[in-house]
C-alpha cells in the first residue's frame, strides 16, 4: 500500500511541477508565491534501501538532520527539462548529499526525493576532489553552474575552499579553483557566490564571494585564474542586530556579510554590488569597477574603503538572501516580518519608507535563505525562494511532523503589480533621481 501511495504521489508531483513551471502564476491575490516543493524532512535517491540503511548505520545519513539553504533552476532544451537544484551544507552531521536536484520520486509521507549532483561519487565526505559542503550556488546565463564549496564539515576545515563550475548541458566539471590559504582565515566560511558574467560568450567573468564569518569579500577573476581578498568595516555584523526573533522564537547569531546581488549594467558599463550582513538592518553598495581592480587590492585588502557606502536609511528587520531583477528591483526577505520585500532602486531612495511587502505569510515565509531571479525561455522573470525553519534549528525545536522547508515561485510582473516596485507603471520621464551616497543614478 505504501509503495502504491508513493507511486501515485510521484505521478502527481510530476504533473504538478509541469503545470507550475509552464506558468508560475497565482490567481489568489493573497497568496502570491506558489508552492513548488515542501518537506518535513529531506530524503534522497539512494541506489536502494540497503544503501540507505547502510548510510544510516555509519552516520552518513541522519534522517531529519539535512537542511537545505539555497535554490536555483535551469531549463534544459533536451531530455532533462527543468532542474531545480538545492544546496545542503554539512554544518551538522548526517548529510549524505551537499548538492542535488529535486526528482519526481516522493516518499510515502510526501517528501520529494533529492538526487545527488552530478552523482554519488562527488558526495563522499572528506574527498577533496569531490564536494564537501556547499552553501549557495548560481547558474549564469551561459549555462554554467557555479558551486561554492566551503570545504568545512561542521567546524572542521577538512578540504580547501574551492569554486567549481559545471556545464549544465553535459553535467561535467569544466573548472575548479582552490583559494590560496593566505586568503582564508580560520573562521572563514564562504557562503554566497555572485557571478558577474559579461560579454556575448561570458569570457569576462568575475565572482564575488561573501565570507560570512571572516567578514570579508573575495573576488575571483575567472579569465586570469586569480583571486583577492577585500576587507571593510561594512562586512561586519552589527551588534545591536545580532538577536533574531522569528515567529516568537529568539536566537543570537553574529554573522557578517551574506546577502549580495548585482544591479543591471549601467549606461556607462559598470554594475553595482549590493550587500548586507545578516546581523544588520543596513544595506550597502560598491561599484564593481572598484572591486574588480586587482592591483588596487593585491597588496592592501583595505584599499578604497570610502568606495563602500552604506545607505543612510535602514530596513525594518534583518535579511538573509537577496536578488535583483533586470529592472533594478531588489527582492529580499524581511526576517522578523515573515515577508518578502522589494525596493525599486531606479525611482526611490533606500529605506523602509520605500520598501514594499509583496508577500507575507507566517507559515510559509520563515527565513528566506535562498532567493533567485530566473529568466525563463520566453524572457519572463520569475522569483524563486527557498524558506527554512532556521529558527527551529537554532533553538532545537525542529519537528518532523511539521513542514520545515519550502521552495516557492512567482512571476515577478504579477508580484509587483501596483506597487512601488512596478517599474513598468512608473512614469519613465520622471526627473526624480535615486541617490546612492556619492553616486547618482538618474532615472532611465
Regions found by a protein language model. Give the residues of each.
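Beta-rich, blade/repeat-based domains predominating
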Residues: 61-81, 125-145, 182-207, 236-272, ...
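Blade-level signature of beta-propeller repeat domains, shared across WD40, Kelch, NHL, RCC1
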Residues: 369-444
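Beta-strand-rich domains and repeat architectures in extracellular enzymes and scaffolds
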Residues: 30-98, 135-136
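Conserved beta-strand positions in repeat-built beta-propeller and related beta-rich domains
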Residues: 82-92, 147-150, 154, 204-213, ...
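Beta-propeller fold detector
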Residues: 109-122, 174-180, 228-243, 293-311, ...
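Short loop/turn segments immediately following beta-strands, especially the blade-tip
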Residues: 103-108, 169, 222-228, 285-300, ...
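Beta-propeller blade signature
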Residues: 97-107, 160-172, 220-225, 399-415
Amino acid at each position: 500500500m505504501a509503495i502504491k501511495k508513493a507511486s501515485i504521489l510521484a505521478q502527481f508531483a510530476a504533473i504538478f511541477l509541469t503545470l507550475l513551471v509552464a506558468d508560475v502564476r497565482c490567481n489568489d491575490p493573497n497568496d502570491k508565491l506558489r508552492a513548488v516543493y515542501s518537506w518535513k524532512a529531506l530524503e534522497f535517491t539512494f541506489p536502494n534501501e540497503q544503501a540507505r540503511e547502510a548510510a544510516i548505520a555509519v552516520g552518513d545519513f541522519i534522517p531529519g538532520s539535512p537542511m537545505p539553504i539555497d535554490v536555483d533552476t535551469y531549463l534544459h532544451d533536451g531530455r532533462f527539462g527543468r532542474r531545480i537544484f538545492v544546496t545542503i551544507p554539512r554544518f551538522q552531521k548526517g548529510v549524505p548529499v551537499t548538492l542535488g536536484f529535486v526528482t519526481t520520486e516522493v516518499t510515502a509521507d510526501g517528501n520529494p526525493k533529492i538526487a545527488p549532483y552530478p552523482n554519488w561519487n562527488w558526495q563522499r565526505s572528506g574527498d577533496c576532489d569531490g564536494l564537501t559542503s556547499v552553501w549557495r550556488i548560481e547558474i549564469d546565463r551561459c549555462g554554467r553552474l557555479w558551486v561554492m564549496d566551503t570545504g568545512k564539515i561542521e567546524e572542521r576545515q577538512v578540504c580547501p575552499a574551492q569554486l567549481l563550475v559545471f556545464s549544465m548541458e553535459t553535467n561535467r566539471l569544466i573548472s575548479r579553483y582552490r583559494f590560496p590559504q593566505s586568503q582564508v582565515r580560520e573562521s572563514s566560511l564562504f557562503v554566497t557566490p555572485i557571478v558577474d558574467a559579461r560579454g556575448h560568450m561570458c569570457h569576462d567573468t568575475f565572482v564575488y564571494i561573501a565570507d560570512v564569518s571572516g567578514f570579508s569579500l573575495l573576488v575571483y577573476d575567472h579569465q586570469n585564474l586569480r583571486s583577492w581578498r577585500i576587507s571593510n568595516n561594512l562586512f561586519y555584523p552589527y551588534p545591536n542586530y545580532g538577536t533574531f526573533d522569528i515567529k516568537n522564537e529568539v536566537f543570537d547569531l553574529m554573522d557578517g556579510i551574506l546577502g549580495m546581488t548585482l544591479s543591471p549594467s549601467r549606461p556607462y558599463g559598470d554594475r553595482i554590488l549590493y550587500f548586507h550582513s545578516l546581523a544588520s538592518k543596513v544595506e550597502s553598495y560598491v561599484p564593481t569597477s572598484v572591486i574588480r581592480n586587482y592591483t588596487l587590492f593585491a597588496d592592501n585588502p583595505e584599499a578604497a574603503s570610502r568606495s563602500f557606502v552604506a545607505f543612510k536609511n535602514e530596513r525594518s528587520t534583518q535579511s538573509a538572501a537577496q536578488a535583483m531583477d533586470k529592472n533594478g528591483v531588489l527582492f529580499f526577505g524581511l526576517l522578523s516580518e515573515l515577508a518578502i520585500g522589494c525596493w525599486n532602486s531606479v525611482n526611490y531612495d533606500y529605506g523602509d519608507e520605500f520598501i514594499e511587502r509583496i508577500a507575507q505569510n507566517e507559515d510559509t515565509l520563515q527565513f528566506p535563505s535562498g532567493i533567485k531571479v530566473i529568466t525563463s525561455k520566453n524572457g519572463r522573470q520569475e522569483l524563486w525562494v527557498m524558506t527554512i525553519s532556521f529558527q527551529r534549528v537554532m533553538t532545537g525545536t525542529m519537528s518532523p511532523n511539521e513542514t520545515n522547508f519550502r521552495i516557492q515561485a512567482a512571476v515577478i510582473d504579477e508580484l509587483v503589480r501596483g506597487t512601488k516596485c512596478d517599474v513598468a507603471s512608473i512614469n519613465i520621464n520622471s526627473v526624480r533621481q535615486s541617490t546612492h551616497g556619492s553616486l547618482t543614478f538618474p532615472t532611465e
